[in-house]
């Protein structure tokens, strides 16, 4: 469950607050200069998978970040601009003259080549999607991965192309739409690829990036969750001192890990507030209370506000309206309980690194809102409290790894994402207590089936939806007129795109039979085979 653990940083960071994470100076670091690519975050994640801390900064702030961060290497991301434009984004020359290894990707290759004296031209043939490159010479990036003379699949997304190399560079690969697909300056340790090595569609991309990190930059990889845990505890103690911290606990991964980490640092100076809005999964409230109050002995205030929330949602059918009502009411209830606790100086939030990245956009302009995100964005200003955000340096997969390091049960650490508004957005149309009970029970049966089949960890997210329609059925000798349950399961790496999970029909048939037999009020079950895009993962 994301609320209140994964707020959008643009809405929660107070005016003037520091928006960059800080990592101990002892760690090896790679700076990623962002030119606006939609997949820049993947570069950072791939680097961290190699045990090296990476940080993304927009190109406008790259020179200052480089001076402060003192990275061991730099990666230039892709981007939507053309280096041929008069106002094209560029890498700071101070970075290119600093003597550290540099890797350019797509736009990063083009700007590196152009800035160092090469030529870039508009391509006669654009390359978008899967492409094949031929390796024309050996290169440190290819060591142990690709051989001279071989051809390999990659993912391209470009219009411009490098046509003349800067002094000191050599071309080491070619493709039909980009005759100089990979460039190398071995003396300066400058390398660049026209293709996107960070995406899964380039099968050997991770290995090539590993070669840059390990063999070119010579980094050993000291970024571990064990080290992070120790450093985070010291930072929390230094920040909080003898102050009191209040943490909104949702039952989701982020808030759970943040709470346990903070409690390990400051003990009973932390109080958690768990607001049950009545739209949680089956037995979820009991599980949260048992784990945090009885197992970890964390001071916990459990508020059953289900009647308040359901009353406010009565008659509401618009999904955006539901989200806004739940978000505002959550703030009201949390604020009231925080005042009862009293004396808190700090508000703990499970802000993650992607939230921090999103707060500094490439263009500085607005983006289209597909769905509003439920968070506690109004709390810091409203409660006049300082923020404690111990996870702000981490990606989601790192949070899970930290949770395991802290000893959190796998049922918490490995659970599928759950939306802040909970079952409210899995119950299209008006929400009632009866509908929520039906949905809660159907969802529990579905997840139980998935776990028994050993499929839970192979699926990014799975859940049931209660449709706002009834259909005719036959049970025994009688006619029924009951609800339809939709089942959804998707595979994904980051939630940005997703494919439906291809269950076999025997599994779906057995699951449908169990739901209809065990859940009163349901007489039909359907399976959603929509990918994202065009659909979204959630129904509302």
UniProtKB/Swiss-Prot annotation:
Catalytic activity as recorded in UniProt: XMP + L-glutamine + ATP + H2O = GMP + L-glutamate + AMP + diphosphate + 2 H(+)
Cross-referenced InterPro entries: Class_I_gatase-like, GATASE, GMP_synth_C, GMP_synth_GATase, GMP_synthase, GMPS_ATP_PPase_dom, NAD/GMP_synthase, Rossmann-like_a/b/a_fold
Keyword list, A-Z: ATP-binding, Glutamine amidotransferase, GMP biosynthesis, Ligase, Nucleotide-binding, Purine biosynthesis
Entry keyword annotation includes ATP-binding: yes
Active site (record annotation): 106, 196, 198
CDD domains associated with the record: GATase1_GMP_Synthase, GMP_synthase_C
The keyword Oxidoreductase is annotated on this UniProt entry: no
A Pfam family assignment: NAD_synthase
Protein residues bound to ATP: 250-256
Top-rank taxon: Bacteria
Annotated ranges, domain GMPS ATP-PPase: 223-415
Listed pathway(s): Purine metabolism; GMP biosynthesis; GMP from XMP (L-Gln route): step 1/1
Residue ranges occupied by any Glutamine amidotransferase type-1 domain in the UniProt entry: 29-222
PROSITE patterns: GATASE_TYPE_1 (PS51273), GMPS_ATP_PPASE (PS51553)
E.C. code: 6.3.5.2
GO cellular component: cytosol
A GO molecular function held by the record: GMP synthase activity
Subunit structure: Homodimer.
Name listed for the protein in its UniProt record: GMP synthase [glutamine-hydrolyzing]
Encoding gene per record: guaA
């Amino acid at each position: 469950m994301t609320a209140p653990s994964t707020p959008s940083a643009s809405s929660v960071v107070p005016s003037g607050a520091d928006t960059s994470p800080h990592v101990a100076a002892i760690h090896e670091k790679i700076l990623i200069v962002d030119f606006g690519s939609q997949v820049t975050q993947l570069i950072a994640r791939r680097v961290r998978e190699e045990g090296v801390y990476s940080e993304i900064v927009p190109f406008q702030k790259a020179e200052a970040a480089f001076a402060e961060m003192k990275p061991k290497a730099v990666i230039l991301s892709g981007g939507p601009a053309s280096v041929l434009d008069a106002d094209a984004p560029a890498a700071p020359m101070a970075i290119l003259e600093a003597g550290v290894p540099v890797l350019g990707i797509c736009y990063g290759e083009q700007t590196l080549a152009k800035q160092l004296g090469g030529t870039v031209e508009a391509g006669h043939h654009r390359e978008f999607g899967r492409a094949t490159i031929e390796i024309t010479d050996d290169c440190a990036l290819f060591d142990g991965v690709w051989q001279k003379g071989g051809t390999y699949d990659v993912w391209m997304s470009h219009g411009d192309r490098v046509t003349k190399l800067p002094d000191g560079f050599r071309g080491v690969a070619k493709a039909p739409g980009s005759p100089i697909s990979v460039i190398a300056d071995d003396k300066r340790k400058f390398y660049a690829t026209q293709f996107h090595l960070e995406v899964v569609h380039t099968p050997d991309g991770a290995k090539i990036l590993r070669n840059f990190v390990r063999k070119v930059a010579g980094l050993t990889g000291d970024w571990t969750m064990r080290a992070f845990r120790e450093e985070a505890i010291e930072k929390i103690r230094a920040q909080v001192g003898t102050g009191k911290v209040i943490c909104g606990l949702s039952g989701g991964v982020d808030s759970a890990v943040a709470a346990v980490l903070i409690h390990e640092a400051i003990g009973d100076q932390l109080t958690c507030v768990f607001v049950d809005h009545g739209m949680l999964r089956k037995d979820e409230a009991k599980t949260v209370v048992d784990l945090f109050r009885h197992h970890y002995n964390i001071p916990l205030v459990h508020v059953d506000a289900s009647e308040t929330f359901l009353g406010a949602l009565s008659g509401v059918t618009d999904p955006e309206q539901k989200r806004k009502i739940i978000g505002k009411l959550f703030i009201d209830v949390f604020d009231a309980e925080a005042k009862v606790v009293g004396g808190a100086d700090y508000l703990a939030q499970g802000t993650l690194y992607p939230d921090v990245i999103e707060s500094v956009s490439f263009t500085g302009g607005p983006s289209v809102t597909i769905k509003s995100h439920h968070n506690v964005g109004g709390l810091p200003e409203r409660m006049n409290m300082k923020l404690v955000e111990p996870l702000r340096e981490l990606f989601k997969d790192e949070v899970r790894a930290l949770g395991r390091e802290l000893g959190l049960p796998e049922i918490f650490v490995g659970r599928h994402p759950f939306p802040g508004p909970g079952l409210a957005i899995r119950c299209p149309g008006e929400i009632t207590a009866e509908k929520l009970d039906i949905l809660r029970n159907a969802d529990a049966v579905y997840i139980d089936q998935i776990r028994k089949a050993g499929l839970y960890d192979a699926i990014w997210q799975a859940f049931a939806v209660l449709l706002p329609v009834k259909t005719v059925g036959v049970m025994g000798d009688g006619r029924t007129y009951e609800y339809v349950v939709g089942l959804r399961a998707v595979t994904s790496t980051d939630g940005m795109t997703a494919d439906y999970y291809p269950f076999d029909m025997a599994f779906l048939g057995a699951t449908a039979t169990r739901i209809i037999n065990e859940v009163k009020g349901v007489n039909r079950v359907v399976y959603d085979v929509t990918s994202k895009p065009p659909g979204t993962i959630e129904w509302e």
